[in-house]
């Protein structure tokens, strides 16, 4: 075959292949169109992407096709049932770590809020950490002076438990410098207190919407729990204080359904002082362990029934659990009266276990450092000093702070009882550290069927930050 014949043969073969490719492409297009028409899907080739936004109560559904987006808004599915929460507390042999946010360590280089008063509360689907921000970030000039408790910049926000209080994952809840929050099985309810000291207002939000308010009745810093409120069969309960921190004040129990207040009652407690109660459900009632900021180094106990009747007194145990406090050996205990005459105090908690009690306290008797939880035999009902178990959570070389209680609902655990849990705040910055700010992180522990070794899950941030050196 001469060269010209070779060229003609190669050209003919190439032309044949080209024609075959064109035919195959045409057939492919025809088949694709026929299949799409038969399936009735039109030209929506891609799958559906669903995004949920924190600030809305709807779901955004985006259907993508080539360069065209079809956006459809649908109602967010809501839970159908209220949580029962009438189960007893589970017996705890020890407390295992549940989460630790390390917010201050992360905040040295991350966008983390300056906060105080963190607490945890759970829905049937998740637990969230709530906290009161100062409207500023760590390592920023606006963090200066955030040792102040009440300001117009403070807001209640939340993240999933274990996350740092960062700007990217936090959800706004309420304008507040004092707060509580809980889930009834259907929606979150928050109570946020804000405004001037002599005319503060508490706004009750339900499902993110303002539903009711409580005006200050004592005109002296209306305030609430700084920990989870308690919902039983759709009714939610919390405790508020209005009046002096260092003498007799006024105390009330509130009851709400779907965020609307349906009942309230004054607590008669002459000679006693109640603040910052840590409450939990137990056998159909609400049990609270509170703070006496007036005289007692023993903690007030409040038990609330669904009809808003109540019993009030003090933790009977012969071991004091407030700070500051005297020596254990010098304390006798009382079920009815404040003892110790130390004044001031710190938010704390306890759990009833039959007649026994698990009670948390700082290790230091005079400052908010270290933290331990102790089990006192018959300590709920008698002046017992029989300490049968102790677990250290933070050693006495490191700062602690507030602490409070919550429970894991049976919807989360699939148990027949409510798991007792607690959190411990670890305050850093002013007045103990050389900084311009005050903030905190937290460790969260939950009750288990086994003994857990003591350790120190302290904050661990290295201070001062760059902003403190300017």
Swiss-Prot record:
Q: Which UniProt keywords apply?
A: Calcium, Disulfide bond, Glycoprotein, Glycosidase, Host cell membrane, Host membrane, Hydrolase, Membrane, Metal-binding, Signal-anchor, Transmembrane, Transmembrane helix, Virion
Its predominant location is virion
Q: Which residues cross the membrane?
A: 15-35
Disulfide links within the chain = 90-417, 122-127, 182-229, 231-236, 277-290, 279-288, 316-335, 421-446
Give residue spans on the Intravirion membrane side: 1-14
Spell out the InterPro entries in the cross-references.
Answer: Glyco_hydro_34, Sialidase_sf
Reactions it catalyzes: Hydrolysis of alpha-(2->3)-, alpha-(2->6)-, alpha-(2->8)- glycosidic linkages of terminal sialic acid residues in oligosaccharides, glycoproteins, glycolipids, colominic acid and synthetic substrates
Which Gene3D superfamilies does the entry mention?
2.120.10.10
Please indicate which superkingdom the organism of origin belongs to.
Viruses
- Catalytic residues identified in the record: 149 (proton donor/acceptor), 402 (nucleophile)
The record's family statement is: Belongs to the glycosyl hydrolase 34 family.
Job of this protein: Catalyzes the removal of terminal sialic acid residues from viral and cellular glycoconjugates. Cleaves off the terminal sialic acids on the glycosylated HA during virus budding to facilitate virus release. Additionally helps virus spread through the circulation by further removing sialic acids from the cell surface. These cleavages prevent self-aggregation and ensure the efficient spread of the progeny virus from cell to cell. Otherwise, infection would be limited to one round of replication.
Provide the protein name.
Answer: Neuraminidase
Gene name?
A: NA
